Amino acid sequence: MNLNEFQQKYAYRKEINYDGQIDLLARVVMEQKERYILQTINGFKPAVVKGKMRHEAISREDYPAVGDWVVLQEKDFNDIVIIDQVLPRFSSIVRKVAGLRTDAQIVASNVTKVFIVISADEDLNERKLERYLTAVWESGASPHIVFSKVDLASDMDSIIEHADSIAFGIPLYKWNATNEEGKEDILANIHEDDSVVLIGSSGAGKSTLINALLTEKVLKTGSVREDDKRGRHTTTHRELFNLPTGGVIIDTPGMRELQLWTEDGDTLSHTFSDINHLIAECKFTDCKHDTEPDCAVKEALETGDLEEGRWNSYLKLQRELAYIERKQNAKLATEERKKWKKISMQQKKNR
């Protein structure tokens, strides 16, 4: 495989901006408990991170993730290559880790499009979709929505209508696994320089869709429990695949929950652009949308132009992001103190 073939096959983009030795460039295609499989110009290689990277890592974001482009050390260790550096990411799907810890988990990096896979055989959970869209817009990638199991939907037109009222022009696809109807529409929107990740709940059909797009069964698929419609986890790790039509696609384990993560204060602006527009029309710039006169938000709620459930969802996500930001700031301050304490102790040793 020459340089052009390697870069084209693994959706290398100019944003990566690497000008070093090409045989030291690799893309992470699989991650399992700090063990990695990389695609290099010379084929697949097992890998680990170098000790210095592990020692200096402050959070999980400092470790490689599926989709990352990495630079290798020149010498390997018993045929295991050593990851020396993670190149800057131009996008990343990030969520807060489950539980009380304020830590980020990278679902996939350097992706151009995110396909949110939703099962059409049950009622559309609008609040969950808003949460997914918020995470995708925050990532720097563009969101797409795929409705799976459309042959089992009781009212597909209603589902599309509801989704469109939230998605505001985001591409929507209908996918039928029994006859693969809709597959060509999806492939037509994945280009050779695209890196696409699929996210969604367990049992939504992500692995089945990837098998269809790859034209071969590379992923195990599972059934859905009839009592609660929850899928069984068939994908246990993240993995990147080449599409025969060009581009790469990343499978991810099903998500029971998606807790948001933020890097700035403008996270909700895309998902709730309608609410942002209303807020801009309020008489007072610091309107709390409570007792103030000439409040466009209150007026829209009263007339029904703004659904109360959507407004409450906006407020809930706003509170969640504010809480995470406060915790992040506290954590950063603690880490900064630890770092300088460590530097001070090292300086004393060197005297």
UniProtKB/Swiss-Prot annotation:
Name its GO BP terms in alphabetical order. ribosomal small subunit biogenesis
Q: What class of enzyme is it?
A: hydrolase
Q: Name one GO molecular function term.
A: GTP binding
- Residues annotated as transmembrane: none
Q: InterPro entries per the record?
A: G_CP_dom (IPR030378), P-loop_NTPase (IPR027417), Ribosome_biogen_GTPase_RsgA (IPR004881), RsgA_GTPase_dom (IPR010914)
Record-listed E.C. numbers: 3.6.1.-
- What does the record say about how the cofactor binds? Binds 1 zinc ion per subunit.
One GO CC term, this protein = cytoplasm
> What cofactor(s) does the depicted protein rely on?
Zn(2+)
UniProt entry tagged with the keyword Transmembrane: no
Residues the record lists as binding Zn(2+): 282, 287, 289, 295
Q: Where does GTP bind?
A: 148-151, 200-208
- Protein's cellular compartments: Cytoplasm
Task: Please provide the record's keywords in A-Z order.
Answer: Cytoplasm, GTP-binding, Hydrolase, Metal-binding, Nucleotide-binding, Ribosome biogenesis, RNA-binding, rRNA-binding, Zinc
One Pfam family this sequence matches: RsgA_GTPase
**Start and end residues of each CP-type G domain:** 100-258
Protein family according to the UniProt entry: Belongs to the TRAFAC class YlqF/YawG GTPase family. RsgA subfamily.
The task this protein performs is described as:
One of several proteins that assist in the late maturation steps of the functional core of the 30S ribosomal subunit. Helps release RbfA from mature subunits. May play a role in the assembly of ribosomal proteins into the subunit. Circularly permuted GTPase that catalyzes slow GTP hydrolysis, GTPase activity is stimulated by the 30S ribosomal subunit.
Instruction: State how it assembles.
Output: Monomer. Associates with 30S ribosomal subunit, binds 16S rRNA.
HAMAP family with a match to the protein in the record: GTPase_RsgA (MF_01820)
Q: What is this protein called?
A: Small ribosomal subunit biogenesis GTPase RsgA 1
Q: Which organism is it from?
A: Oceanobacillus iheyensis (strain DSM 14371 / CIP 107618 / JCM 11309 / KCTC 3954 / HTE831)
